[in-house]
């Protein structure tokens, strides 16, 4: 008879698109985020923690005629018939908080948030359904000083976690300038908002592919279209040659100085009121940053930044790491973007009907941590705790006292809690824990009032071929008075 399926043991496996974080992965991420939080705190930003679960209505998702919410979120229906979902970013919860507590929060409201988000998307290599975000936003200020502050804060955050100047650049652009350029080129008609948005979207999707397709590929997509290597044809935006060249000119407008870049942008936007407003905002941001000591070696106006132009309403910024790494095929490439943000002035409007200006930035936590590992600032093998071994079951109190003394001195220590019968297994455990020191005291050592300290790091070095002189100058095992346990361990660790 077939085995009863109900009695089958559950499989111990992580769901597709999810992963577990162990030891150093957790501590390194926490250390990095703590450093970033300290920067945000100095800038006057307050921490905010929101529920992992939001109403689908608050998230801005709609409910199609199916049994679950729109693809992209993990959602379910509760007993009251309300649709709930795990948050897919940290911005949507901020919008809800800003609307719900608008009479209690200061205005402007500066907040930062860090935590996991969930997206119901097809997983793949390096693409997970749960990942960490680190956001900082200012809600309630229309001043571009708020945008400049976000850029400066982002620069400081990158440096404090270990990305030196010269290895990163924060690039700033403005959606208003691109809109002005397209208006002058005759691509957009501001009097028809629906058509304006549709046509702008087509152009944005084309220029957003600049990194992958290059200038030639984007130029083709701005025109009739592009045929790829497989022969598949992608219909283009249908711009005339003159219109396409104006848009391409916008992306190539960067000059050696911010002033020269702004001058070129003014030429491109011509008489467009919106475009001139965008150029003025970029000039003001550059001036405010320069007044604080943030020069073009750290933050620069760069019209080639196109990511997010379809989402933001004004200035946009992107932090790019400029040092080289080797990809999976051994080829050199720049590390690339680790953070992005911008101004989005419709944050709270759908809740209250009133426009509330906002600007912010989001750091890709996993990408930034990967960058630190590539720079050797993270990923080093973490040191484990000092392990106090057990030689006599009847003296557990003595061993616990040793552990307590070490901990009170600020040292990481633990007592071996496995079966103490086989001492070799205790040392194997200490090795598996990457312990630097093992504390040993049998009945003979206890009678003489001493303990034995085994330097496991040096022992490993000797096993790997340390010289005789090195071994003699620092023996891998020493005997010290019991009263000197803490000092001796501290000396060995130093």
From Swiss-Prot:
Signal sequence range: none
Gene Ontology terms for molecular function: ATP binding; histidine-tRNA ligase activity
Stretches of the chain forming a coiled coil according to its record: none
Keyword Aminoacyl-tRNA synthetase attributed: yes
Top EC category: ligase
UniProt KW Translocase keyword: no
One GO term (biological process): histidyl-tRNA aminoacylation
Subcellular location: Cytoplasm
Subunit structure: Homodimer.
NCBIfam families, sorted: hisS (TIGR00442)
Matching PANTHER family: HISTIDINE--TRNA LIGASE, HISTIDYL-TRNA SYNTHETASE
Protein name: Histidine--tRNA ligase
Source organism phylogeny: Bacteria, Pseudomonadati, Pseudomonadota, Alphaproteobacteria, Rhodobacterales
């Amino acid at each position: 008879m077939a085995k009863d399926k109900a009695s089958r043991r559950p499989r111990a496996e992580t769901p597709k698109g999810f992963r577990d974080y162990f030891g150093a992965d957790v501590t390194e991420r926490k250390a990095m985020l703590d450093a970033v939080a300290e920067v945000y705190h100095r800038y006057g930003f307050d921490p905010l923690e929101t529920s992992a679960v939001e109403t689908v209505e608050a998230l801005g998702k709609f409910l199609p005629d199916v049994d679950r919410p729109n693809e992209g979120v993990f959602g379910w229906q509760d007993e009251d018939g309300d649709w709930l979902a795990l948050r897919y970013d940290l911005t949507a919860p901020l919008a809800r908080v800003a609307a719900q507590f608008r009479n209690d929060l200061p205005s402007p409201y500066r907040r930062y948030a860090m935590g996991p988000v969930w997206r119901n998307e097809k997983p793949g290599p390096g693409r997970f359904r749960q990942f960490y975000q680190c956001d900082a936003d200012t809600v309630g200020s229309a001043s571009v000083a708020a945008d400049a502050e976000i850029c400066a804060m982002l620069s400081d955050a990158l440096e404090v976690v270990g990305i030196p100047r010269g290895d990163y650049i924060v690039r700033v652009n403005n959606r208003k300038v691109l809109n002005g350029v397209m208006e002058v080129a005759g691509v957009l008609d501001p009097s028809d908002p629906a058509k304006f948005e549709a046509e702008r979207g087509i152009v944005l999707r084309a220029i957003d592919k600049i990194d992958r397709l290059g200038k030639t590929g984007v130029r083709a997509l701005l025109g009739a279209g592009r045929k790829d290597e497989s022969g598949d044809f992608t219909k283009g935006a249908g711009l005339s040659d003159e219109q396409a060249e104006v848009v391409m000119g916008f992306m190539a407008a960067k000059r050696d100085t911010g002033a020269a870049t702004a001058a070129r942008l003014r030429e491109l936007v011509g008489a467009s009121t919106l475009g001139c407003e965008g150029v003025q905002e970029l000039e003001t941001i550059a001036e405010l940053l320069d007044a604080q000591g943030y020069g073009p070696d750290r933050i620069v106006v760069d019209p080639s930044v196109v990511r997010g132009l379809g989402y933001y309403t004004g200035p946009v910024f992107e932090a790019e790491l400029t040092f080289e790494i080797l990809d999976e095929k051994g080829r050199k490439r720049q590390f690339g973007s680790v953070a992005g943000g911008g101004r989005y002035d419709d944050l709270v409007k759908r809740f209250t009907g009133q426009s509330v200006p906002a600007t912010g930035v989001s750091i890709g936590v996993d990408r930034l941590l990967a960058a630190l590992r590539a720079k050797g600032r993270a990923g080093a093998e973490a040191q484990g705790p000092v392990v106090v071994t057990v030689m006599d079951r009847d003296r557990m109190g003595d061993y616990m006292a040793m552990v307590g003394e070490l901990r009170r001195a600020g040292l990481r220590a633990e007592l071996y809690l496995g079966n103490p019968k086989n001492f070799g297994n205790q040392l194997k455990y200490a090795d598996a824990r990457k312990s630097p020191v093992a504390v040993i005291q049998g009945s003979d050592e206890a009678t003489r009032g001493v303990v034995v300290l085994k330097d496991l790091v040096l022992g490993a070095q000797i096993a790997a071929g340390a010289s005789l002189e090195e071994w003699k100058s620092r023996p891998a095992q020493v005997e010290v008075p019991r009263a000197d346990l803490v000092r001796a361990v501290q000396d060995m660790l130093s």
